[in-house]
Amino acid sequence: MKNKQKVSSDKFTMMTQMPVNKLICKMAVPTIITMLVSAVYNMADTYFVGKIGTSATGAVGVVFSFMAIIQACGFFFGHGSGNYMSRKLGEQKTEEASEMASTGFFSSFAVGVIIGVLGLIFISPLSKLLGSTDTILPYTKQYLFYILCGTPFMMSSLVLNNQLRFQGSAVNGMIGVTAGGVLNILLDPIFIFVFKMGVGGAGCATMLSQAIGFVILLIGCTKKGNIRISFKNFRFKKQLYKEIFRGGIPSLARQGLASLAMVAMNRLAGGYGDAAIAAMSIVSKIMNFFGAAVIGFGQGFQPVCGFNYGAKKYDRVKKAFWFSVKVTTVFMTVVAVFGFILSPYVIALFRRDDTDVIAIGSFAFRAQCISLPLSGFIVMANMYLQTIGRAKAATLTAMSRQFLFFVPALLLLVHFFGLTGVEISQAAADVAAFLFSMPICLKVLNIMMTEENKIQ
């Protein structure tokens, strides 16, 4: 017990006394790796299934929207419980953090079981609801069957990973997620081609990879200094679920609305042909890859923010925030410059033989490169507000980029400029989201620093 208290004390000392620049970089390396691995193996999954045929590829695309919903629920419980845990650990209230860890985990697993069972019962209507045509419906059901079986593991793995991250143990989370991702890449061709399971093999590989990653993450929770998951710590308390809701609803809003926004863009782009859909899809994948690095860095910032906010070391929170904004802005500016210059070559890596795709994608990519440097502040502002428990402000800023501004910009710009409107809509939404988020974030920062002055 004394050893465990010493480890917890050592972690508290590190999180609240180590220079924030060094601390954030230490926390961010494993989270960046985790995010990039996830981005890469999602692209690899699509690559292998693409060799089966167009209908199989379409089925994976249809089910991917359902997987985004599972992820949104996982982030809801993971960020909701994790934010609260980091603040309580900063206050050195380990018992309350332990109750939240177990409550968040078991709640997510139960919701995953319910979604999985209901999905299996209604798999045909669910497949059609997600957008399956009669041609791809058989493939969708094959793939979706395994995804539904793995839903509890997928959802609760996201919770465990985020809880470990908010405790300052991102390396343990990285190991679990990376192991699952690498295993998925290895199993995909084996199940699809060697075992001749087709698209169902891709789903089976994903399910097994998620289950094994889940076990590794659970083991990570038993490492010294980490909070163990135990059913005896589960509490069906209104206050705990209120905190999960406060901390998790911004993530649910961001992830869920982003999926709806993507559907809207694909529908409008579809009016200009398959090349437009393909081009915008390629640009989205590229942007998501670089965005994953920014989110990964932000996930390194969040536990530092949560611990020090809980410990009332507001000056360290402010320093951590602005350091994170500077690093991500510089990174995205470099990406934007090279992306703008090399745009046609980057798009051609994905679809070299279609000049229409390259032309449409290059213009859209360059348009987004113009607003790309603003994304660092937008992401960090949202993560800061979410971590300190400003649920309403965090939800608004989370919704702003992909819904409040993107969908109206898309509809308006398409009406006036046609396909060009589709290509520039995300850049326009980014500028609006930046102008919207900045005053909200700065106001909350000023309120926090006023509290710092009162303490001193």
Language model features with spans:
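Transmembrane helical elements of multi-pass membrane transporters/channels
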Residues: 26-45, 146, 180, 209-213, ...
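N-terminal transmembrane alpha-helices
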Residues: 15-47, 51-52, 68-80, 84, ...
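Helix-terminus/linker motif at the lipid-water interface of multi-pass membrane proteins
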Residues: 36, 40-58, 127-134, 190-197, ...
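Short runs within selected transmembrane alpha-helices of multi-pass transporters and secretion channels
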Residues: 78, 147-165, 175-181, 202-215, ...
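Small-residue-rich hydrophobic transmembrane alpha-helices
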Residues: 57-117, 154-173, 266, 279-343, ...
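Hydrophobic transmembrane alpha-helices of multi-pass small-molecule transporters
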Residues: 69-72, 184-189, 214-218, 289-292, ...
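Interfacial/gating helices of multi-pass transporter permease domains
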Residues: 48-68, 135-139, 199-202, 240-247, ...
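Short alpha-helical transmembrane segments in multi-pass integral membrane proteins
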Residues: 1-28, 85-152, 194-249, 305-371, ...
